Amino acid sequence: MPSFRNSRRRLRAAVAVALATCLVTTGCSSESGSGGATPTGDYTIWDPYPQFDDSSAWVRLLTTCGTDAGVTVERTGYDTTDLTNKALLAAQQDNSPDVLIVDNPVVSTLADAGVLTTTDEVKVDVAAVSPNLLAAGRIGGKSYGIPIGANTLALYYNKKVLDAAGVDPATVTDWTSLTAALTKVKTAGKKGITFSAIGTEEGSFQFLPWFWGAGANLTQLDSAQGVAALTLWTDWLKNGYAPNSVLNNTQTTSWQEFAAGDFAFAENGTWQLANAKKTGFEYGIIPIPSQAGGTAPAPTGGEFVTAPVQSDTARYAVTEKLVACLTSADNALATDTTLSYIAATDAVQRTQVADDDELTVWVEAVKAAKGRTSDDLGTKYPKISQPLWTAFQAALSGSASPADALKTAQTTAAAATK
């Protein structure tokens, strides 16, 4: 456990970054009356779901959990970026919410800044949580929250396009069979695969299944395995299996390309399930294959329920009740269904599949998934991701070979993470 003095120093540094971000974006206010220092009986919860108003099932759940714990819950929903900034500022003012729900890559940032308690400190039971999902919130062997659920990536396919090309999606089990399928699709006069390779975190998110699926590691971007993954993508563009638009595609615009009906495959996430039903064509979903076969580890998305540090540690007893209520099996099932997430425990995953067998492939993908900040990368991850997306942008645009692009990326990442 880092010393209090060092934690406060890191917190001040993190707040400085947050303040700079606020000045560039939307501006921040201290909102000194809305944090943890509230009257006895009032507990605050901050979440990244501003789309849910007080009449929503989500807010009703928060209220019910408070009532069951004998307290009144005061809830505020923020946009994800704004939430991180406000959490850092509130911690500096000793005014943190009692429960903070944040995107999983943010957990390491807040934990490193000394903002969060460990699950051991608050006595939150994480024994039933899938270890690969819990890992996104583990730093230095300690857990700093519990996942509310997870989303990840897989391959959607257009059955009509594959049928016309004579491709059985069940035969797509590795990179060789996937590329062979794309060849047949192109020969049949259709489009192969669309994805997002934009120069942002979205692009890295979409590249990681191929990178990890080759056996590469984020601590060595220019390994032979990493080069193989980037070569797969560049070869697809060279051969016309993927469009040049992937360089600027977000996950949303990539989906729009697939929804137009001409592409055989699209790499996208669980959050597109509702939209898939609206496409007007028969679709299916298969896991993203690893190079040698099997399901590739895809990155996890989704939020963690965390407990910020409070000067009055007696509050943790109620905080534990709130967290336990929000993540209980019945409540997790309802919340994950609303958010199009896969649950974080085997028991709830089995219930999800029993209710909707279309989720089977997503459960398989989540079981193989991996947190971007896992392997104790923590706050180093963003310093690795940016050189990585710079590398695949360079290689896909033809300004550098995959090997040279990743060599440059490794040099940059190594210097940034010393």
Where are these regions (language model features)?
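Hinge/lid segment of periplasmic solute-binding proteins
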Residues: 104-152, 179-180, 187, 206, ...
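Conserved C-terminal helix/tail region of periplasmic/extracytoplasmic solute-binding proteins
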Residues: 2, 163-164, 368-418
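Periplasmic solute-binding protein
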Residues: 110-115, 133-170, 198-218, 300-308, ...
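Extracytoplasmic "Venus flytrap"/periplasmic binding protein-like
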Residues: 66-131, 164-166, 264-265, 275-276, ...
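Extracytoplasmic/periplasmic substrate-recognition and gating elements
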Residues: 165, 238-242, 277-339
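Glycine-centered hinge/linker elements that transmit conformational signals in sensory
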Residues: 182-186, 219-247
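Conserved N-terminal structural module of periplasmic/extracytoplasmic solute-binding proteins
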Residues: 2-107, 292, 314, 318, ...
